[in-house]
Swiss-Prot record:
Changing residue 333 to A: 2% quinol oxidase activity, loss of Cu(B). It is found in: Cell inner membrane. It comes from the Bacteria. Fe(II)-heme o binds at residues 288, 411, 419. Ubiquinol oxidase catalyzes the terminal step in the electron transport chain. NCBIfam families: CyoB, PRK15017.1. This is Cytochrome bo(3) ubiquinol oxidase subunit 1. Heme b binds at residues 106, 170, 421, 481-482. The gene is cyoB.
Length: 663
């Protein structure tokens, strides 16, 4: 009746796991108790869990990302500690099978459930505001996409206490991920968490692609869009083009494991290299899905805090488009050593070097934006400057790895680990923190505490270099990745330095948590009354902070690239409209969370081979979707009186701030 599931699936014999599970359960119970104590369940259901408001969904994405960052970083600390101990001749505190699960879960969590939700959260929060839209093209799909992401998060975390996670590495190469070498449920947890969350990401890509192309404000041509919107558009093109590859690849691996097919096994005509080609044909565009939007974040911040127009807008846009195209013809650089031949390796090595050119164009554009600007060293700007330095180092090591001869020496070494953390942390993570700092007042109506923000930045950037520069040296010294036992003692000093860097990063994360707490506590002292705390240039700053649920009472007409800056220059930024009209808006829907609940049941049942429960979960998903499809009560009109009330409150705050007509 319960398939493979039994009490033996709970790892009672592993104290680290059991303590972690106890902590998660106690934390969850405390949260439920607080919500119940304050009587907030109805509020949460009506205003957040069933919301189709892009801003609230963006905030929820970012909350999920921050929570999972804590989980993913805990894995990182354990890995660094284990390697430091193992290189000193100790056995360490992690048995090999547990260590292997940790490095797999760390990669999966950080890419799929930290970086992706954070980037998509920023897109949700900002893109409709930047283009003058009232919501995304498909509001319900936006809600459903979020909940599919949550399904993946739930399954990954359940694997901690029920069964195990994959021990294969984050991309689950066969034959190790095949049923012969991984007969347990670990790879199945990997499969279903990625497959279900991947559906949500694909829907997000379609949603934002349509939103940006079809819902821009009057007068906003493509080359009047903010750079962040351009970067988001290109990232969503990549999502639409690449995520179906992941879906099909994982589906074929599922068939190998569940039905005994042989797509990726060498016997019966299969080929494991086909899997590796397919997974990286998705995997390398995925890197740019993450990095392109944060390039847009840095573009917005550099212009705002340099107090001048963005340098080289057109070249920035075309560089973004070039990266989007080139990202599909570099994937083989992930496996130069696997026998493709010299000509093939040379082609992909050259394309990898070429893709560095548009990235370099962007870096020089940001530098020239700052040149002769009146730079304000706000914490968002510090993250940007830190990114330029850190990402440049990572980019140069990437070009080095693009040389097949060098890659043969460094493949699967800690040099590679240092390189991709250099670009992911120095690029994506720094960009997400910069974007959170920059747009926090827009989301919540008050600014983040600067003192703690700067402390977080310095701990992060110093910790990063202390943690990862030794790994470059260890890579040259011959240390390969994913070692947990019997590590050469000559590596001990470098591994201890790297572990101390991880501790500094932990302090940086602590500073970020304290920053949010202090900012919420002191929010009344840091209110943003005008909606424009930084002297912004784009349309999101034309609304109140936080914006009303309809975003714009009157959809703005765009005449210049820096639309809001132009309004301020002409003295039109805060003019009261002559009249308002009713606004057409979507209604909230609980169908998304219900479909997600059934999806979680379906995924869990498939992992444990509980076939009757899988049928219940799948049927529940389909029936809910069909019922939702016949629901025609999906929208309403906001009355003029409500709009006037909210807008008058905003104009009163503007008057308090001493602003009038944008001057």
């Amino acid at each position: 009746m319960f398939g493979k599931l039994s009490l033996d699936a709970v790892p009672f014999h592993e104290p680290i796991v059991m303590v972690t599970i106890a902590g998660i359960i106690l934390g969850g119970l405390a949260l439920v108790g607080l919500i119940t104590y304050f009587g907030k369940w109805t509020y949460l259901w009506k205003e957040w869990l069933t919301s189709v408001d892009h801003k609230r969904l963006g905030i929820m994405y970012i909350i999920v990302a921050i929570v999972m960052l804590l989980r993913g970083f805990a894995d990182a600390i354990m890995m660094r500690s284990q390697q430091a101990l193992a290189s000193a001749g100790e056995a360490g505190f992690l048995p090999p099978h547990h260590y292997d699960q940790i490095f797999t879960a760390h990669g999966v969590i950080m890419i799929f459930f930290v970086a992706m939700p954070f980037v998509i959260g920023l897109m949700n929060l900002v893109v409709p505001l930047q283009i003058g839209a009232r919501d995304v093209a498909f509001p319900f799909l936006n809600n459903l996409s979020f909940w599919f992401t949550v399904v993946g998060v739930i399954l990954v975390n359940v694997s901690l206490g029920v069964g195990e996670f994959a021990q294969t590495g984050w991309l689950a190469y066969p034959p190790l991920s095949g049923i012969e070498y991984s007969p347990g449920v670990g790879v199945d947890y990997w499969i279903w968490s990625l497959q279900l969350s991947g559906i949500g990401t694909t829907l997000t890509g379609i949603n934002f692609f349509v939103t940006i192309l079809k819902m821009r404000a009057p007068g906003m041509t493509m080359f009047k869009m903010p750079v962040f919107t351009w970067a988001s558009l290109c990232a969503n093109v990549l999502i639409i083009a690449s995520f179906p590859i992941l879906t099909v690849t994982v589906a074929l691996l599922t068939l190998d494991r569940y039905l005994g097919t042989h797509f990726f096994t060498n016997d019966m005509g299969g080929n494991m290299m086909m899997y590796i080609n397919l997974i990286w044909a998705w995997g390398h565009p995925e890197v740019y899905i993450l990095i392109l939007p944060v390039f847009g974040v840095f573009s917005e911040i550099a212009a705002t805090f340099s107090r001048k127009r963005l340098f080289g807008y057109t070249s920035l846009v075309w560089a973004t488009v070039c990266i989007t195209v080139l990202s599909f013809i570099v994937w083989l650089h992930h496996f130069f050593t696997m026998g493709a031949g010299a000509n093939v390796n040379a082609f992909f090595g050259i394309t990898t070097m070429i893709i560095a050119i548009p990235t370099g164009v962007k870096i020089f554009n940001w530098l020239f934006t700052m040149y002769q600007g009146r730079i304000v060293f706000h914490s968002a700007m510090l993250w940007t400057i830190g990114f330029i330095v850190t990402f440049s180092v990572g980019g140069m090591t990437g070009v080095l790895l693009a040389v097949p001869g060098a890659d043969f020496v460094l493949h699967n070494s800690l040099f590679l680990i240092a390189h991709f953390h250099n670009v992911i942390i120095g690029g994506v993570v720094f960009g997400c923190f910069a974007g959170m700092t920059y747009w926090w007042p827009k989301a919540f109506g008050f600014k983040l505490n600067e003192t703690w923000g700067k402390r977080a930045f310095w701990f992060w950037i110093i910790g990063f270099f202390v943690a990862f520069m030794p790994l470059y040296a260890l890579g040259f010294m011959g240390m390969t990745r994913r070692l947990s036992q019997q590590i050469d003692p000559q590596f001990h000093t470098m591994l201890m330095i790297a572990a101390s860097g991880a501790v500094l990063i932990a302090l940086g994360i602590l500073c970020l948590v304290i920053q949010m707490y202090v900012s919420i506590r002191d929010r009344d002292q840091n209110r943003d009354l005008t909606g424009d705390p930084w002297g912004g240039r784009t349309l999101e700053w034309a609304t109140s902070s936080p914006p009303p649920f309809y975003n714009f009472a009157v959809v703005p007409h765009v005449h210049e690239r820096d639309a809001f800056w132009e309004m301020k220059e002409k003295g039109e930024a805060y003019k009261k409209p002559d009249h308002y009209e009713e606004i057409h808006m979507p209604k909230n829907s609980g169908a998304g969370i219900v479909i997600a609940a059934f999806s979680t049941i379906f995924g869990f049942a498939m992992i444990w081979h509980i076939w009757w429960l899988a049928i219940v979960g799948f049927a529940g998903m389909i029936i809910t979707w069909i019922v939702k499809s016949f629901d025609e009560d999906v929208d309403y009109y906001v009355p003029v009186a409500e709009i006037e009330k909210l807008e008058n409150q905003h104009f009163d705050e503007i008057t308090k701030a001493g602003l009038k007509n944008g001057n």
